[in-house]
């Protein structure tokens, strides 16, 4: 169960992996983009994972229609606003929404910097007067290669004051972290944090590389850390967080079933691991499902779940005063 006396956070949540099917339909019609279906029910199998995909890259293809329909910057702004509406509807107190400006821009010839500006504007507009707080994490989509990621980074750094971190996501096998060392030097020079997708498609060495060469303070997924006890000790001792995404790891076939998921072992080891959604619309789940269904299936007790909930606040990219304010707010409701 979710402890409502603690803040509820989702700090690994892809904005461009959470585009409503209805919105895809409406934007497709608006921009005369041919979609694989003309109603929500028929569209769902094309934009949502129904059965586990064979691998990460097959899973990621389900996100494509959500960005294919982004025909102008107002469309980008719209999905940013709807992401905040969805987070508030779920009772989330704080979200870190991550997005890849190049991925969102490329299908309809938008400029990544314009996408960044539109997303920031949408988030600022939607959070005014809302019960959910939000920060943004920019993504470098490694799948497009080193040069495109530099363009993407340039677009993000133009608005660095509106971001809390930069992430590296996409094809971990085809484009390993070693290719992006120079990019993350620029990230740290801009005084932004780094959270890296690692140990999802590759093994523990990918996580070591993310920490040692890319300066990661958090690891997205990090499932393969379980293979290396020294790494688990290091994550615990250096307080490097793991953003676990239970259902996602099943749907990408990173883990075969939840009973085998290492989140419970991470928590038992003292690692600051937490529970997140990843791509809610694509997975057909929300944060409540991860806490009430997926976490118990992964062997977590109520105490484990509350620990994971508290860990999310501890590793969130928030100031001490902001964390304290969230704790105070939650404790009095």
Swiss-Prot record:
<feature type="binding site">
    <location>
        <position position="170"/>
    </location>
    <ligand>
        <name>substrate</name>
    </ligand>
</feature>
<dbReference type="GO" id="GO:0006154">
    <property type="term" value="P:adenosine catabolic process"/>
</dbReference>
<keyword id="KW-0378">Hydrolase</keyword>
<dbReference type="InterPro" id="IPR032466">
    <property type="entry name" value="Metal_Hydrolase"/>
</dbReference>
<dbReference type="GO" id="GO:0009168">
    <property type="term" value="P:purine ribonucleoside monophosphate biosynthetic process"/>
</dbReference>
<feature type="binding site">
    <location>
        <position position="279"/>
    </location>
    <ligand>
        <name>substrate</name>
    </ligand>
</feature>
<feature type="binding site">
    <location>
        <position position="12"/>
    </location>
    <ligand>
        <name>Zn(2+)</name>
    </ligand>
</feature>
<dbReference type="InterPro" id="IPR001365">
    <property type="entry name" value="A_deaminase_dom"/>
</dbReference>
<comment type="similarity">
    <text>Belongs to the metallo-dependent hydrolases superfamily. Adenosine and AMP deaminases family. Adenosine deaminase subfamily.</text>
</comment>
<dbReference type="GO" id="GO:0008270">
    <property type="term" value="F:zinc ion binding"/>
</dbReference>
<dbReference type="GO" id="GO:0005829">
    <property type="term" value="C:cytosol"/>
</dbReference>
<keyword id="KW-0479">Metal-binding</keyword>
<feature type="site" description="Important for catalytic activity">
    <location>
        <position position="221"/>
    </location>
</feature>
<dbReference type="Pfam" id="PF00962">
    <property type="entry name" value="A_deaminase"/>
</dbReference>
<keyword id="KW-0862">Zinc</keyword>
<dbReference type="GO" id="GO:0046936">
    <property type="term" value="F:2'-deoxyadenosine deaminase activity"/>
</dbReference>
<dbReference type="GO" id="GO:0004000">
    <property type="term" value="F:adenosine deaminase activity"/>
</dbReference>
<dbReference type="InterPro" id="IPR028893">
    <property type="entry name" value="A_deaminase"/>
</dbReference>
<feature type="binding site">
    <location>
        <position position="16"/>
    </location>
    <ligand>
        <name>substrate</name>
    </ligand>
</feature>
<feature type="binding site">
    <location>
        <position position="14"/>
    </location>
    <ligand>
        <name>Zn(2+)</name>
    </ligand>
</feature>
<dbReference type="GO" id="GO:0043103">
    <property type="term" value="P:hypoxanthine salvage"/>
</dbReference>
<comment type="function">
    <text>Catalyzes the hydrolytic deamination of adenosine and 2-deoxyadenosine.</text>
</comment>
<keyword id="KW-0546">Nucleotide metabolism</keyword>
<feature type="binding site">
    <location>
        <position position="14"/>
    </location>
    <ligand>
        <name>substrate</name>
    </ligand>
</feature>
<dbReference type="InterPro" id="IPR006330">
    <property type="entry name" value="Ado/ade_deaminase"/>
</dbReference>
<dbReference type="GO" id="GO:0009117">
    <property type="term" value="P:nucleotide metabolic process"/>
</dbReference>
<feature type="binding site">
    <location>
        <position position="278"/>
    </location>
    <ligand>
        <name>Zn(2+)</name>
    </ligand>
</feature>
<dbReference type="GO" id="GO:0046103">
    <property type="term" value="P:inosine biosynthetic process"/>
</dbReference>
<protein>
    <recommendedName>
        <fullName>Adenosine deaminase</fullName>
        <ecNumber>3.5.4.4</ecNumber>
    </recommendedName>
</protein>
<feature type="active site" description="Proton donor">
    <location>
        <position position="200"/>
    </location>
</feature>
<feature type="binding site">
    <location>
        <position position="197"/>
    </location>
    <ligand>
        <name>Zn(2+)</name>
    </ligand>
</feature>
């Amino acid at each position: 169960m979710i402890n409502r006396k603690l803040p509820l956070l989702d700090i690994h949540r892809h904005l461009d992996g959470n585009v409503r099917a209805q919105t895809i339909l409406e934007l497709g019609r608006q921009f005369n983009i041919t979609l694989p279906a003309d109603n929500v029910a028929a569209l769902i199998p094309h934009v949502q994972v129904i059965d586990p995909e064979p691998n990460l890259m097959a899973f990621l293809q389900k996100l494509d229609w959500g960005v294919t329909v982004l025909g102008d910057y107002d469309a980008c702004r719209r999905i940013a606003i709807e992401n905040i509406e969805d987070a508030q509807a779920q009772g989330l107190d704080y979200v870190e929404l991550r997005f890849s400006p190049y991925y969102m821009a490329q299908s309809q010839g938008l400029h990544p910097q314009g996408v960044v500006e539109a997303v920031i504007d949408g988030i600022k507009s939607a959070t005014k007067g809302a019960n959910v707080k939000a920060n943004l994490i920019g993504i470098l989509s490694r799948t497009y290669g080193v040069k495109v990621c530099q363009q993407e980074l340039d677009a993000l750094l133009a608005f660095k004051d509106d971001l809390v971190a930069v992430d590296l996501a996409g094809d971990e096998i085809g484009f390993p972290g070693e290719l992006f060392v120079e990019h993350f030097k620029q990230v740290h020079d801009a005084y932004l944090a780094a959270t890296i997708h690692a140990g999802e498609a590759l093994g523990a060495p990918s996580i070591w590389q993310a920490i040692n060469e890319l300066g990661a303070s958090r690891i997205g997924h990090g499932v393969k850390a379980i293979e290396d006890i020294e790494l688990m000790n290091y994550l615990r001792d250096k307080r490097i967080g793991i953003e676990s995404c239970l259902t996602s790891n099943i749907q990408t076939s990173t883990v075969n079933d939840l009973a085998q998921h290492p989140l419970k072992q991470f928590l038992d080891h003292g690692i600051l691991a937490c529970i997140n959604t990843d791509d809610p619309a694509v997975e057909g789940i929300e944060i409540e499902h991860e806490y009430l269904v997926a976490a118990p299936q992964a062997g977590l007790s109520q105490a484990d779940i509350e620990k994971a909930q508290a860990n999310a606040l501890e590793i969130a990219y928030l100031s001490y005063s902001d964390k304290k304010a969230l704790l105070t707010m939650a404790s009095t409701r």
